[in-house]
Each structure stands twice: as structure tokens, then as C-alpha cells.
Amino acid sequence: MRYNRLLLQLIVLISLFAACRKQWSATEEDMANYGWSLYEQGDYVTSYEWFSNAIIEDKNFQDGYNGLGWTFGKLVELDSAVQTFAIGLSKPPNERIATNVSQEILAGLTFAHSALKKDSSVILYGDSLIWLINQQIGEKTWTFTHDSTTNYLDVYVTLALSYYALSDYEESVANIQAVKTALNPASPPYIVNTTTVRGREELAAEIEYLQNFLRGR
């Protein structure tokens, strides 16, 4: 009798364990988190698959579109990156995710449009991101969660390049000044005479210098 009772208890426990295992499945957050791990390791082809699965699981999961957009950027699928980021920007934030995903999407849109030479769009999204950063309480900075070498200074330099391309030299200089001040608060004002060819050449050289400097950090 005692043996039968123990056997019955064992069967019940095994059944419960099996049922729990069947009920568990990866959530969209699990998929995206693994996608980001792969992204950080440089495995962009596989990260693409995991981010794609995340948004199949939940078509409103903003960070899935964020990850997929950045992955498309790494795969040099720039039009796809822009389209994916744009969809992600329209999705609601997930309150369980501490990262400001909208800021990461705006940065992604800024860089993708820059690579596509769409300067007006660079300014639209880049200025929007800088505005949001400046509304923050405390430190007015932004760093990409999944690559700390990419931050708000890259956004400023990208904006400087696009403003230069559109012949808005005053705004280009202002963005260069923002970078210089962030790197060294004691740096003197950046002054260049952009009414002359030589002055514009100096500004272009400064933009290129800062781009290379920030890449090499």
C-alpha cells in the first residue's frame, strides 16, 4: 500500500514537471536579448534571425525592431534599416525595458540616413535625438547600450556633416563646438570664417578629423 502511494506521488510529480516544461517558451524579450548578445559578438546574420522571431512573436515589440534595424545597418542593408527603424519608432515602449529604445532608434535612423546621403533626414532625426537628450534630468548624454563606442558625440559630428552638405555652415559649426566642449569644457570657441573657400575647407577638415578621432577612441 505504501509502495503504491509513493508510486502515485512520483507519477504526479513527473506529470507536473512535464506540463511545466511544455508550457515554457521563449518570449519576444528572450529572443531579442539573445539577438543582442549575438549582435555584440558580431554575429549579425544569426542576430537577424532572432530579432525577426521577436517581432513575429509580438509585432508591437519595439526593441525587436530596434535590434533588427541596427543589424540591417551592420549588414549594409540601409534601406531595410530605415524602414525597420521607422516601424519601431511608431511602437509603444515596453515598461519592462529600462533602455530608452526610442533614442536608440533615432540614433540608428540618423546614422543610416547619413550613410544614404539623405542629409535632411539626418537633421530631422539627429536634432530630435539631441533635443530629447537635452530634456533629460542630470547628464545630457547618450550612449548606445550595445556598443559603448557609439554615443551622442557621433550624432553631433554626423549632424555637422549634414549641415555642411546643405551649406548651413553656422549649424555645422555649432555641432562641432558641441563636440569640442564635451571633449574639453575648457576649450576655446571654435571660430572659422565660412564665407571664404578656405574657411569652409577648414571646417570640412575639422569634421573629418573629429570623425576619425571618435572612431579611434
Could you say what each language-model-derived stretch is?
Residues 64, 97-98, 105, 139, ...:
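TPR alpha-solenoid repeat register
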